Amino acid sequence: MRLESAQELKQRLLTDIIIPLAAHATRVRVAGARAVATAAVAGAEPLTVFGVGARPFDKVPQIQRSVALGVARHQGEYRLAVRVQRPALLHSPMLEHVRLQAKGEVEIRVVGRIDKRATRVRAATAATAHAATPWYQRDMRPLLIGASVGHYKVTAGTTGAFVKRGTRTYLLSNNHVLANEDNAKTGDWILQRAAYDGGKQPAERVARLRYWVRLKKTSANSVDCALGEILEGIPCDASLLRGIVAGADRHLAGVGPGFLDVGATVYKIGRTTGVTEGRVTAFDLDNVVVNYDVGNLRFDGQVEIEGIGTHSFSDGGDSGSLIVDGDIQAVALLFAGGDTGASNGLGLTFANPIHPVLKSLKATLLS
């Protein structure tokens, strides 16, 4: 189908089916939790209410994982991208209705749970415990794209890029890396390397938190981003992408086009997996529900990427990585991923398109 047709179909199905059903599921779970609380006051056993083991009201996620919809391609034709976040929905009447409405022009993948990518930083195994620490997990002066960074209370994330806002220079990464999911305050210290990688205060202080886009808990987000103002005397190299293509250094060539099509080859440098190559598998994905410490959050307008070969494109700790295209232009900011859904049997990565990121922060990319 044509691109416009795929986008129109996606929006209609989201509005008429997916979002209303997800909202209904949330209301049912909240109602069940309230019933549990009421039953507890009355001395009843929680498991007898509604025949299910509803959870306490304050622990019910406000947004439920269901199905994300976007745009994919098959043999040159656009089609509806269907991303199932709860495997139990794979054979549901809802999904069958989506198939029928799309007249079979769908690409369905079970992606399961999606997490922010600053979590699950894995401890070294016996095989890697004595390996040399890679450069992107060490102190880097000048500051480099791809290096370990984080709010002093956050485990570890990645330095995405460097930007200008007014006359000041800032470090770009995710909200959940620099602003601790809105739990930080303006002026908080940013460390490079991050605390998980041994960053200490005051030695590794490189920036102060200045600007971030707050995360919405009950409506759709489009970005997860924040800026740290780089301290006087801390140098940065705003263009070097160390070993980004086939082990060779390249230099960032500015901001890429707003449209990132399926099949495009992309690269990133991240704190955990270093340099990886991937391909875009879907774009304009809406209703992507991501697990954060503050609960499940919904994102619209996202890009989906899978790793090329036998590796995932990202892992926990790669949050905030700048994603560049084949022309080494910035196209997206990595923020989330899962363990399933890619054609190589591994997980998928999700990213904010770079244009909304820069616009929301009123920033200009340095290169």
What are the functions of these language-model segments?
Residues S5-G166, Y170, N183-K217, L231:
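Protease-domain processing segments flanking chymotrypsin-fold serine proteases, especially trypsin-like
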Residues Q85, A253, G270, N344-G347:
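Hydrophobic alpha-helical scaffolding
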Residues A88, L178-A179, G338-T340:
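Solvent-exposed loop/turn segments at secondary-structure junctions
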Residues L90-G104, S239-R250, F350:
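Surface-exposed flexible segments
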Residues T133-G307, V324-G326, F335:
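Serine endopeptidase catalytic core focused on the charge-relay Asp
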Residues E304-I305, S312-F313, V324-S367:
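C-terminal subregion of chymotrypsin/trypsin-like serine protease catalytic domains
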Residues D315-S319:
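Short, small/polar residue-rich loop motifs at catalytic or cofactor-binding pockets
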